[in-house]
């Protein structure tokens, strides 16, 4: 025999449990060097700067 729930899960209980399943909106900050929107605590992909100093060499196009 399979395991069966003893009581029906109410809409309120189900929805309260599902409140944490939503995707979070990621925050963006502007780069101090080139003012491009980037993810915080990550090297800027357009200029290669992180915390005011050059970390990556970026090919200029």
UniProtKB/Swiss-Prot annotation:
Residues 1-18 have a biased composition (Basic residues). Residues 1-20 are annotated as: Disordered. Keywords: Ribonucleoprotein, Ribosomal protein. GO terms for cellular component: large ribosomal subunit. GO terms for biological process: translation. The keyword Ribosomal protein applies. GO terms for molecular function: structural constituent of ribosome. Belongs to the bacterial ribosomal protein bL32 family. PANTHER family: 50S RIBOSOMAL PROTEIN L32, LARGE RIBOSOMAL SUBUNIT PROTEIN BL32. This is Large ribosomal subunit protein bL32. It comes from Mycoplasmopsis pulmonis (strain UAB CTIP) (Mycoplasma pulmonis). The gene is rpmF.
